Amino acid sequence: NTMGISTPIFSPTGNIKKSANDLAKYMIMHSQLGKYEGGRIIPKKLSQQMQAIISEEEGYGMALENTTQLIAGKTMIGHTGSAYGLYSMLFFEPKEKIGFVVISNGCDTKTINGFNAVLHQTVNSLYNNLIR
């Protein structure tokens, strides 16, 4: 691993070190604009701001990305992560109420449309075999 490449100089995880289950809860909360299990976790306006595109070139808002490059025909909102041989992503489509959290270990750096190839293929396999 090269400092600043596979692990940014500051915390590579934004100091979020969570399980797949915890990431799924975070994803559900954002897909419901700040609500989770009937309670408000963050203000609706804040969740909307975090999801709003600030950088048109990259599709990023404040921590969350909008992309059409993950699943064909879908605009997904989410975030990727990588550090020390771990690759992860959480992405959701709020209108259809679908979402994915995928975590993998390894050092495969191949990409598809800018996403780790293993994660991209896994999300598409889950979508095609379980949802579509």
Give the role of each language-model region.
Residues 1-132:
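Catalytic loop of the DD-peptidase/beta-lactamase superfamily, centered on the K-T-G motif
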